[in-house]
Amino acid sequence: MKSTVEQLSPTRVRINVEVPFAELKSDFDKAYKALAQQIRLPGFRPGKAPARLLEARVGRGAVLEQVVNDALPSRYSEAVTSAGVKAIGQPEIEVTKIEDGELLEFTAEVDVRPEIELPDFSSINVEVDPIEITDEAIEEQLLSLRQRFGTLTGVDRAVEDGDFVSIDLSATVDGENVAEATASGLSHEVGSGQLIEGLDEAIIGLKAGESKDFTSTLVAGEYAGKEAVVTVTVQTVKERELPAEDDEFAQLASEFDTLEELKADLRERVARVRKVEQAGQIRDKVLEQLLETVEVPLPEAVVKAEVDAALHDAVHGLDHDEEALNKLLEEQGSSREEFDKDAQEAAERSVKTQLLLDSIADAGNVTVGQDELTERILFQAQRYGMAPEQFIQQIQQANQLGAVFADVRRGKALASVVESAGVKDTSGAVVDTAELFGSSEDETEADASDSAESEDK
């Protein structure tokens, strides 16, 4: 088999392939075997009819068609591998010549990963917020903990912000009752904003047994986007009494004996959260600077596939009715044109990010260990509230294990850029990224330690 590659654009190639018929013998054997199982000829047991008689029955053209259809995928893959083509997406294959007994020729056009010129990562400089742990932040955490251990007590007064109420709701749109917006005995924390917009403002000042009408725009159901008249009736009013800030509370709410020990632990927790937040900000800003400075040609077919996927997700809950989507967007003050524009921009950014990080990973020989892959799977399973075994089965059935692997590899590629970049906070202090992300030296030492342990075993 011979193959040549034509570069059609920075992101697309045409592979020209020639396959001598002598190399198709196994494909012919497979085709004849399949036909022998399907066709019964007098005097021959099933599967034993000779090739020439089978060919006489179905015609040479049908045999050639079967052989070519079976041969194309494997010969295409072989050509891609031998040429070192980094193909992405599905190819467009066209058979250009069949000389029976002599030669099969076909072409395959496919999108490829573009060549990307990477910058010197040490030239990247970003500025992030400093890690600040204030007394107010500690008190906020302590208040949240006290609220968890608070008790609710019924009160005979008007509703105030922060109270807990039991309410009945009903709504109408143009005089029509909205069934999905009708409920009785709903528990609600006033000021949380967790139910209908405008509800908190309406019930503050009401007493148990009193009602009030207000208008609100419904966000779901048959009347999504419509303005409704909502009636709320307060059934009960309760206030939350908080435990005192003392050693007794510390012993109740934690493993510590004193309030000061509890506050010290809360300070450490806040510090960990602030470090995670700062690490996220560093990653985001480094990636943003990479995307702004590095030129990445985008494969049109890959971008289009992401745009199509966004549209599919949007209409999935609307019985795949695009007119229903257009109507919903209009009711939300948007339009199909804006939706398409946003989907296009999001797809272009997503594809550019993937190609760029893959290129960085290739240049840095970034690898992903089994432990790293397992850690990511366990993290995602916990995030979705699923058992790890169930989550693994789900991603395997959806052929998404490769996507998880690629995601981990891209994350490591970005971390390698962060390691080389210059990072300061807004006060001018240099941020030690190794403390937040680790370093390549740490990873090398860990790999060496793992190898040594394996040898000891």
From Swiss-Prot:
The gene is tig. It is an enzyme of class 5 (isomerase). Disulfide bonds: none annotated. Residues 434-457 are annotated as: Disordered. Keywords: Cell cycle, Cell division, Chaperone, Cytoplasm, Isomerase, Rotamase. Belongs to the FKBP-type PPIase family. Tig subfamily. GO terms for molecular function: peptidyl-prolyl cis-trans isomerase activity; protein folding chaperone; ribosome binding. SUPFAM superfamilies: FKBP-like (SSF54534), Triger factor/SurA peptide-binding domain-like (SSF109998), Trigger factor ribosome-binding domain (SSF102735). GO terms for biological process: 'de novo' cotranslational protein folding; cell division; chaperone-mediated protein folding; protein transport; protein unfolding. Residues 162-243 form the PPIase FKBP-type domain. This is Trigger factor. Signal peptide: none annotated. Involved in protein export. Acts as a chaperone by maintaining the newly synthesized protein in an open conformation. Functions as a peptidyl-prolyl cis-trans isomerase. Its EC number is 5.2.1.8. GO terms for cellular component: cytoplasm. Consists of 3 domains; the N-terminus binds the ribosome, the middle domain has PPIase activity, while the C-terminus has intrinsic chaperone activity on its own. Residues 440-457 have a biased composition (Acidic residues). PROSITE patterns: FKBP_PPIASE. It is found in: Cytoplasm. It catalyses: [protein]-peptidylproline (omega=180) = [protein]-peptidylproline (omega=0).
